[in-house]
A protein has these predicted regions:
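Carbohydrate-associated surface elements
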Residues: 171, 191
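Nucleotide-activated donor-binding/catalytic signature segment of Leloir-type glycosyltransferases, i.e.
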Residues: 244, 252-274
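Short hydrophobic beta-strand element within catalytic cores of glycosyltransferases
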Residues: 300, 309-312
C-alpha cells in the first residue's frame, strides 16, 4: 500500500457517479480507481446504464444502477408534476442507497461532481463519512446552479453532509472555500492516464489543435477570430484543426460560417466525432485551451504527455498547469494573435509537468485514511 502498508484491511469506498457514460469527471473517477485499487475496495453507483458499465466490468468493479435526478436544474414552483416526480424518484433513490450502504458497509461514501445529491443524504442518514469531489465551477463553465436554484441552501447541505470536499484545482477550491467555510476543502490534482504510442508519420497535420467537445465555453470563436485578425493584419496565418464531438448543431453552424465567411478554409479545419487522443495529439505541435472557466484542464496534461506545448487562456484552473517549459498563457486577443502568428515564441526546453502525480495520489490516500 502507498502509505498504509501496515494496514491489513483495505477501506471500502462507495462512489456515486453523476452520469452513466464516460465523461471528464467519470474518467477522473476511473483513473483514481486504477491508481488506488491496492489501497481501497471500490464500488460505484450509476444513475443509468451507459459506457461506464463496460469500463467498470473491465476493472471488475461492482456497480449498482440507482435511477435518480440531480439538483442542477431549475423549475417553476407551479410545475407540480415535475416536482412530484423529483420528490418520488429522490425518495426512492435515497431509500435504495440507504439499504445499499447498510448492506455493503462502505467506510467512505463519495459523490462525484456537484450534480447528484441523493447519496449524500443516504450517507448522512447512515452516519458514513462523505466526501464530495468537485470537478467543475458550475455556473461559470456549464451554466448550471445546484439546489434547484437555491444555492445558499445547497452550500449549507454540502457542509453539513461532508467530512471533506476535494477540488481538482486551486481555482475550484478557492471558489468553494468562500462559499463553504465550515468544511475542510483540499486541492488534489488528478492522475491523467496516457498510453504512449509510436508515431508512424512525423509530418504534422497542422500546427495548432483544439481537442474536445465543441461547446461555446471552450472559446473556439475567439481563436478563429484571432486567425481572421492575423489575415487582416497581414501576419503569418497559422493552421488549426478543431476535433471533437458536438451536440449543438447551431454552434457548429456558427463556427463553420465564421470560417467560410472569412475564407479561412485553407487554415481552419473542423471535424466532428470521437477521436483517439493518443493517436491524434502527436500529429500536432501546439494544443490550444481557450476556455474561459476551465476547472482543471486534463487535456493540457494529455498534450504535454504527447509532446505538445500548450497555448492556454489565463483563466480558471488551467494556468495552474503551465510553467516555463510546457506552454504559454494569453490574457487577451492581442496576446492570442501574437502566439498564433509566431510573434510570441513557445518554450524550446524539455516539457515538464507542474505537479507530481505520485505525490498527489499519496496525498489523497493519506486524506482518506484519516477520515
Amino acid at each position: 500500500m502507498l502509505a498504509n502498508s501496515n494496514k491489513l484491511v483495505k477501506k471500502k469506498i462507495l462512489w456515486q457517479a453523476h452520469e452513466g457514460n464516460i465523461s471528464g469527471a467519470n474518467l477522473a473517477m476511473l483513473e483514481y480507481i486504477d491508481v488506488l485499487q491496492n489501497e481501497f475496495d471500490f464500488s460505484v453507483i450509476l444513475p443509468h446504464e451507459g459506457s461506464m458499465k463496460q469500463a467498470l466490468v473491465k476493472r471488475k468493479i461492482p456497480f449498482f444502477v440507482i435511477r435518480q435526478y440531480g439538483w442542477a436544474n431549475k423549475y417553476h414552483w407551479w410545475a407540480f408534476g415535475k416536482w412530484m416526480k423529483i420528490l418520488l424518484r429522490s425518495f426512492k433513490a435515497i431509500t435504495q442507497t440507504f439499504r445499499l450502504i447498510k448492506k455493503s458497509a462502505p467506510d467512505i461514501v463519495f459523490t462525484n461532481t456537484l450534480v447528484p445529491f441523493t447519496t449524500s443524504v443516504a450517507a448522512k442518514m447512515t452516519r458514513r463519512p462523505h466526501v464530495w469531489w468537485i470537478h467543475e465551477f458550475g455556473k461559470e463553465d456549464f451554466g448550471f446552479t445546484i439546489g434547484w436554484g437555491n444555492e445558499k441552501w445547497a452550500w449549507k447541505w454540502m457542509q453539513v453532509s461532508s467530512q471533506l470536499i476535494i477540488g481538482n484545482s486551486r481555482a475550484i477550491s478557492s471558489k468553494f472555500s468562500n462559499l463553504m467555510p465550515k468544511v475542510k476543502i483540499e486541492t488534489i490534482y488528478q492522475p491523467v492516464s496516457w498510453q504512449k504510442r509510436e508515431t508512424k508519420d512525423s509530418v504534422k497535420k497542422a500546427r495548432f489543435l483544439m481537442f474536445g467537445q465543441l461547446i461555446e465555453s471552450k472559446g473556439h470563436k475567439d481563436v478563429i477570430e484571432a486567425i481572421k485578425a492575423c489575415k487582416e493584419m497581414g501576419k503569418k496565418l497559422p493552421t488549426l484543426h478543431i476535433l471533437g464531438p458536438s451536440e449543438n448543431s447551431e454552434y457548429l453552424k456558427e463556427l463553420n460560417e465564421l470560417v467560410h465567411k472569412n475564407k479561412l478554409q485553407n487554415y481552419v479545419h473542423i471535424e466532428i466525432g470521437y477521436f483517439n487522443k493518443e493517436e491524434v495529439m502527436p500529429q500536432y505541435e501546439v494544443l490550444i485551451v481557450a476556455s474561459k472557466s476551465e476547472a482543471f484542464g486534463r487535456v493540457i496534461i494529455e498534450a504535454n504527455k504527447a509532446g505538445l506545448h500548450v497555448l492556454v487562456r489565463n483563466s480558471g484552473g488551467s494556468p495552474e498547469l503551465i510553467n516555463a517549459s510546457n506552454g504559454v498563457l494569453f490574457n487577451n486577443q492581442n496576446e492570442l494573435i501574437a502566439a498564433l502568428s509566431g510573434e510570441k515564441l513557445f518554450p524550446d526546453s524539455t516539457i515538464r509537468m507542474n505537479y507530481n502525480e505520485s505525490l498527489e495520489v499519496e496525498k489523497i490516500n493519506e486524506l482518506l485514511y484519516s477520515l
